[in-house]
């Protein structure tokens, strides 16, 4: 690597690092704004123990943890939806929703849209209940491990073991 390439690579790393730091700083600032607005630093908030943290600790596998995280993210989206008309904290909520979008949905708009469709489905609607029950078998089959997947088989060479004996 020549000197010019090294300088360009260094500048790129510095820019990316500082922008990441700036984004994280803005994210934490907006969380602090929400904490202040909701008076979430008050000692009585801890009464009854944590809301999500103990549950998250119980799940170690990444795939299992994703299930719990999806429920928690769903909660936050519902919370932000209920507060969407509050102009005092709108910027903070938008910043945090954007960070959730990047971290949880890998910046995939289609994943976010599907997720939002799911959390908007009304559970008390009879038509929705009927459709859900109608689709239950397919959903359960989709959840089950795929037992009939073709597994790669080793070739059965009849001369394979004989060479080792000679």
Swiss-Prot record:
Residues 1-23 form the signal peptide. It holds the Pfam family IFN-gamma. Released primarily from activated T lymphocytes. The keyword Transmembrane does not apply. Glycans are attached at residues 39, 106. This is Interferon gamma. Homodimer. Interacts with IFNGR1 (via extracellular domain); this interaction promotes IFNGR1 dimerization. Keywords: Antiviral defense, Cytokine, Glycoprotein, Growth regulation, Pyrrolidone carboxylic acid, Secreted, Signal. One of its GO terms (molecular function) is cytokine activity.
